[in-house]
UniProtKB/Swiss-Prot annotation:
[4Fe-4S] cluster binds at C575, C584. It catalyses: reduced [plastocyanin] + hnu + oxidized [2Fe-2S]-[ferredoxin] = oxidized [plastocyanin] + reduced [2Fe-2S]-[ferredoxin]. It comes from Porphyra purpurea (Red seaweed). PROSITE patterns: PHOTOSYSTEM_I_PSAAB. The lineage of its organism: Eukaryota, Rhodophyta, Bangiophyceae, Bangiales, Bangiaceae. This is Photosystem I P700 chlorophyll a apoprotein A1. It is found in: Plastid, Chloroplast thylakoid membrane. GO terms for cellular component: chloroplast thylakoid membrane; photosystem I. Chlorophyll a' binds at H677. Keywords: 4Fe-4S, Chlorophyll, Chloroplast, Chromophore, Electron transport, Iron, Iron-sulfur, Magnesium, Membrane, Metal-binding, Oxidoreductase, Photosynthesis, Photosystem I, Plastid, Thylakoid, Transmembrane, Transmembrane helix, Transport. The keyword Iron-sulfur applies. Its EC number is 1.97.1.12. Chlorophyll a binds at M685, Y693. Phylloquinone binds at W694.
Length: 752
């Protein structure tokens, strides 16, 4: 390895701040638009209020100082954390004040979770359904009850205490946000010291975070859950601190506790295998992962992250330098490789954010898929509404993050990219062969679209003609997903073979036996067939189109053959000015706008597939003799192979619960279903009409106001083209999300 040159020697880390850089002035903040000279003058037209909202958090437009932008972002993060703690506090408070948590804890299979009781004002107390145990309330599907049980919370008092703790943390975060902007604001070099930042986040946030959670799981969750699992009532379980200070109490449950730390220091770690296990599979009592497995997992992660937090070179001259690692990365086809990327990532927060959003979005989608295959908390697997809600939620979060990655990648290209500093490096070479990338991606989209859709069209046609023997199906022309089935089989065979210490498979989705809790299926092998093969290629198609739109937007955000000077027009512009027809929807912003619709397409197909597949092939009841009867009786394999099947046997058949919900505790979902359709339809008014139409209409209305001498002082203006599109896509997605939410929950709460 090359010795670092003098330029690359790591600067010593020191905490450097500016004292009292910005006054705390309520007078200034009280003036709307104080952050912009133009907006601070006040409104002349109605466009002002739109620009106020668009630019309030666009720190780039408020100052050209990277240090000042960094400080604003840093301070805003504390504000975000304050909101999160406030929200957490509210959740715990609802659990303490309005929920049936303790009743649920004593009978989790017979009582449904509820944390909201609707007050009777105009008859809406109809929403308080009977959730069992004599409690009337709204059934909740957030998974909080299961998480609280896994944490070892057994009383409302503990929930109250945590809620108060959350409020305290929120106040602390608000103070920190103010303090680090107005009193002691970090200098730019502090924000740019990536080695120190990586060390602290890896060791502190992830390492100590995992260690703390592992400690909590070992000392509190495990003993309390062991007692709950064996039927001890929550009221009889000792208080949490008893388990911390009374070693004899712990030793009764986990004998190795009587040996203390001797096995640890004598490296005889196997002694601790009574509470740090490697069982695999699910706890047959709760249908969740073994808590001793998850404690072991978090302890192992803590060790890894604490080690990783000592990996980067700061004040001691040992360890990695991020710049050196990046610049050493040179492949045979990548020219100067990663040269210049360090400078990009330390001076462009948009570039940094784009990568982080892509990673976090992908991670959220991975979480969605793990949470049903390996249900992490006790009794969550048999709470079907919660399982469906959490899958849908994490898919949506992931989708928005991934599109956000495309957005900020384009903003980086327009605002922060410097061609002179990126000659022949990886980014430059990607941009130079963008035509090949985009045209290949386009070909893939066309291929996937026509072939996957073509399979469905073929099946619909054959079924219409009564030629079922000529259809693609498990009973005619089979298209089995052989690679997926092979992956399932190697995971099923792993325990005792390639995973010699595991007692059971990582997930029963791969194979194995049916795990049932309270006569309901928690998890069982998911058989994959022709219907899955077909819909998976629809997933591939919609995801690739989303990627095509976002990647094209990013690669062509500075210039294109059509508009060579795009970078001068900015991130969002409606078209290339008068006299240039056919240049609409080419800005980076417009690609994000279009990408959002395809993201919605992708996720709708994915969550519909999940919802139907689980109801058809996994979720259901188990008879005393062990027979499983699924909610929709296994109709997925034969119905999901035609478009008509999706429309008739999924959308229409399963919408009956939401459509017929009036007069029942689920009637709110019927109203939401209706209202969200309305919001969605409202969006089309913005998406399908031009600005001129509205400007003409407004001028007539203003004329009428002038006629009767009630003309407004602020001149009304139609929305700009971009504003109209923004309002349109926002209502389109909101309407779509609301409709899907009501459709899913009314259905699954009724039948699940």
């Amino acid at each position: 390895m090359a010795i670092s040159s003098k330029e690359q020697e790591t600067k010593k880390v020191k905490i450097s701040v500016d004292k009292n850089p910005v006054d705390t002035s309520f007078e200034k903040w009280a003036q709307p638009g104080h952050f912009s000279r133009t907006l601070a003058k006040g409104p002349k037209t109605t466009t002002w209020i739109w620009n106020l909202h668009a630019d309030a958090h666009d720190f780039d437009s408020q100052t050209s100082s990277l240090e000042e932008v960094s400080r604003k972002i840093f301070s805003a993060h504390f504000g975000q954390l304050a909101v999160i703690f406030l929200w957490l506090s509210g959740m715990y408070f609802h659990g303490a004040r309005f929920s049936n948590y303790v009743a649920w804890l004593s009978n989790p299979t017979g009582i449904k979770p509820s944390a909201q009781v609707v007050w009777p004002i105009v008859g809406q107390e109809i929403l308080n359904g009977d959730v069992g145990g004599g409690f009337q309330g709204v059934q909740v599907t957030s998974g909080w009850f299961q998480l609280w049980r896994a944490s070892g919370i057994t009383t409302e008092f503990q929930l109250y205490c945590t809620a108060i703790g959350g409020l305290g943390m929120a106040a602390l975060m608000l103070f920190a946000g103010w303090f680090h902007y107005h009193k002691a604001a970090p200098k730019l070099e502090w924000f740019q010291n990536v080695e120190s930042m990586m060390n602290h986040h890896l060791a502190g946030l992830l390492g100590l975070g995992c260690l703390g959670w592992a400690g909590h799981q070992i000392h509190l969750s495990l003993p309390i859950n062991k007692l709950l699992d064996s039927g001890v009532s929550p009221q009889e379980i000792p208080l949490p601190h008893e388990f911390l200070i009374n070693r004899e109490l712990m030793a009764q449950l986990y004998p190795s506790f009587s040996k203390g730390l001797v096995p640890f220091f004598t490296l005889n770690w196997a002694e601790y295998s009574d509470f740090l296990t490697f069982k695999g599979g699910l706890n047959p009592v709760t249908g969740g992962l073994w808590l001793s497995d998850t404690a072991h997992h978090h302890l192992a992660l803590a060790v890894l992250f604490l080690a990783a937090g000592h990996m980067y070179r700061t004040n001691w001259g040992i360890g990695h330098s991020m710049k050196e690692i990046l610049e050493a990365h040179k492949g045979p086809f990548t020219g100067n490789g990663h040269e210049g990327l360090y400078e990009i990532l330390t001076t462009s927060w948009h570039a940094q954010l784009a990568i982080n959003l892509a990673m976090m979005g992908s991670l959220s989608i991975i979480v969605a898929h793990h949470m049903y295959a390996m249900p992490p908390y006790p009794y969550i697997a048999t709470d079907y509404p919660t399982q469906l809600s959490l899958f849908t939620h994490h898919m949506w979060i992931g989708g928005f993050c991934v599109v956000g990655a495309g957005a900020h990648a384009s903003i980086f290209m327009v605002r922060d990219y410097n061609p002179a500093e990126n000659y022949n490096n990886l980014l430059d070479r990607i941009i130079r062969h963008r035509d090949a990338i985009v045209s290949h991606l386009n070909w893939v989209c066309i291929f996937l679209g026509f072939h996957s859709f073509g399979l469905y069209i073929h099946n619909d046609t054959m079924r219409a003609l009564g030629r079922s023997q000529d259809m693609f199906s498990d009973t005619a022309i089979q298209l089995q997903p052989i690679f997926a089935q092979w992956v399932q089989s190697i995971h099923t065979l792993a325990p005792g073979n390639t995973a010699p210490n595991a007692l059971a498979t990582a997930s029963y989705a791969f194979g194995g036996e049916v795990v049932s809790v309270g006569n309901k299926v928690a998890m069982m092998p998911i058989s994959l067939g022709t219907a899955d093969f077909m819909v998976h290629h629809i997933h591939a198609f919609t995801i690739h189109v989303t990627v095509l739109i976002l990647v094209k937007g990013f690669l062509f955000s500075r210039n294109s053959r059509l508009i060579p000077d795009k970078a001068n027009l900015g991130f969002r512009f409606p078209c290339d000015g008068p006299g240039r027809g056919g240049t609409c929807q080419v800005s980076g912003w417009d690609h994000v706008f279009l990408g959002l619709f395809w993201m919605y397409n992708s996720l709708s197909v994915a969550i519909f597939h999940f919802s139907w597949k689980m109801q058809s092939d996994v979720w259901g009841s188990v008879s005393p003799s062990g027979n499983v009867s699924h909610i929709t009786g296994g109709n997925f394999a034969q119905s999901a192979i035609t478009i008509n099947g999706w429309l008739r046997d999924f959308l229409w058949a399963q919408a009956s619960q939401v459509i017929q919900s009036y007069g029942s505790a689920l009637s709110a979902y019927g109203l939401i279903f209706l209202a969200a359709h309305f919001v969605w339809a409202f969006s089309l008014m913005f998406l399908f009409s031009g600005r001129g139409y509205w400007q003409e209409l407004i001028e007539s209305i203003v004329w009428a106001h002038n006629k009767i001498k009630v003309a407004p002082a602020i001149q009304p203006r139609a929305l700009s083209i971009t504003q109209g599109r923004a309002v349109g896509v926002a209502h389109y997605l909101l309407g779509g999300i609301g409709t899907t939410w009501a459709f899913f929950l009314a259905r699954i709460i009724s039948v699940g």
